[in-house]
Amino acid sequence: MGKIIGIDLGTTNSCVAIMDGTTARVLENAEGDRTTPSIIAYTQDGETLVGQPAKRQAVTNPQNTLFAIKRLIGRRFQDEEVQRDVSIMPYKIVAADNGDAWLDVKGTKTAPPQISAEVLKKMKKTAEDYLGEPVTEAVITVPAYFNDAQRQATKDAGRIAGLEVKRIINEPTAAALAYGLDKEVGNRTIAVYDLGGGTFDISIIEIDEVDGEKTFEVLATNGDTHLGGEDFDTRLINYLVDEFKKDQGIDLRNDPLAMQRLKEAAEKAKIELSSAQQTDVNLPYITADATGPKHMNIKVTRAKLESLVEDLVNRSIEPLKVALQDAGLSVSDINDVILVGGQTRMPMVQKKVAEFFGKEPRKDVNPDEAVAIGAAVQGGVLTGDVKDVLLLDVTPLSLGIETMGGVMTALINKNTTIPTKHSQVFSTAEDNQSAVTIHVLQGERKRASDNKSLGQFNLDGINPAPRGMPQIEVTFDIDADGILHVSAKDKNSGKEQKITIKASSGLNEEEIQKMVREAEANAESDRKFEELVQTRNQGDHLLHSTRKQVEEAGDKLPADDKTAIESALTALETSLKGEDKADIEAKMQALAQASQKLMEIAQQQHAQQQAGSADAQASNAKDDDVVDAEFEEVKDKK
């Protein structure tokens, strides 16, 4: 069985790890970094860039450089959170035919899982380069508070990337695995506070050790899937834009290029203010008007940044209270607090968390790598490489169906350990009713319409009977990935209907297969592009070296040969501007044929140089034929 890799598919950065024996190892990507920016760019010449290369060109290509895609995965276009992003993102968010939030990439509607798959492909390639063998299986992490649609969309992204997703696990749970596996912690209750680039989670986890086996049991989880570092950046960007408008009278929001530069500068300033008390945002030539170019130079203090984001930090505190309450614990029952996610490096966040729990968070967990390490550990558990570890996760939100009067009736309550199965018997609302619609919901509200609709299906063929008489058994079954399977059975007729909830906003099987095929086709075109570039480089090198040799040969090269070589050089130069690898190779071959006489002259010149060098060394040796004398230094006596 091959390796199951662990992937932290983050909003801002992603990370991949593997089990190396009994130790998890975070892998460096092609650029030599342990984390990869979750940024995808589509260039004018049809190339797809992922990670640092995509980030570097964002300023000149803002509309086709996509970031924070995780905030859109599994979401409807009309969702309030999506509408907030529509107005501030430099790229175009559009409504798909099924009402999903998709993206407009160079005029083509593209699904978020398809774009996230590009990041997963890079993670897969990083692991394959390290292992020297193909990788086909992965454990991928998601925020604990992701709903069913978001989990399913993440699995779809994995499939499009050519990965069989063996397990979806919650990010805080993965961080707890990374923290607890190699420590002799005994029985402990830990709080994992995970504030990443786009999402926030809190999980209360109990680590029990019995006879050498460690059980990681999630007692409760809560969070906000639209709160993270990107929101902190946006606050700072808005402040800088407003200050510039006050000073110069120009609103930079209408200038995508300026906004992209500002986004980079704001992110950098935010990071600097975690260690410094103040920083300068200095952007020369940020824009121009009739009077000439304009420059931005604004001083930002840590206190100013904290005042801009204080309500965001406070927003993360309420879920902490709810999670503790759901777990039936008080603050004093928590032994350790673990911080995960890059945004937790902000001193204000650390201070607020310390104040709430009454203890300093632990500093021995890498907030950027812990989640990927935990995913790799779970991969090791699935392959049998990691033994004596049992992971008991929970479903983050209640699951149920709509019943008479538009009420949601929960079949599985939030924070129930998964996998789990629960059945309940319902009946008809009308006399002689022959069919019922099962409307599946996820959420905590009593009114059905206030919860997230996960989909619906019909159970037909119910025998005519007075209302309330038929017995319809509805069963909810949640697998270890937190994905829901629902069935409804008429106990009288034995008729049954089943569905795996794909959510009304999910991709159907046909769409996923099409995207998988496109990804495979792209992999082939990427390979061909790489081969073309290598051939071009060889051609460039041949051009340069041949021209140099023609120059060095001078009059020794016959005129006919020189003309033939010049003609072959021109032909190769023209071919290098094209896209035909075979033609470039043919022109290189033709140049080599035409250059045979030149090669002979070059070899003769080289031989003469070697002979001349040998003569010079012999002559120097004669000059050096002198006698060394020993001498003794005698110091004068004073």
Curated annotation (Swiss-Prot):
Induction: By stress conditions e.g. heat shock.
Keyword Transcription regulation recorded: no
Cross-referenced PANTHER family: HEAT SHOCK PROTEIN 70KDA
Name under which the protein is recorded: Chaperone protein DnaK
Family to which this protein belongs: Belongs to the heat shock protein 70 family.
Organism, as annotated: Klebsiella pneumoniae (strain 342)
InterPro entries assigned: ATPase_NBD, Chaperone_DnaK, Heat_shock_70_CS, HSP70_C_sf, HSP70_peptide-bd_sf, Hsp_70_fam
Segments of skewed composition (Low complexity): 602-620
Function: Acts as a chaperone.
Keyword annotations of the record: ATP-binding, Chaperone, Nucleotide-binding, Phosphoprotein, Stress response
Lineage, top ranks: Bacteria, Pseudomonadati, Pseudomonadota, Gammaproteobacteria, Enterobacterales
Region Disordered: start-end pairs: 599-638
Residues where Phosphothreonine is found: 199
Any one GO molecular-function label of the UniProt entry: ATP binding
NCBIfam families (UniProt xref): PRK00290.1, PRK05183.1, prok_dnaK
CDD domains found in the cross-reference section: ASKHA_NBD_HSP70_DnaK-like
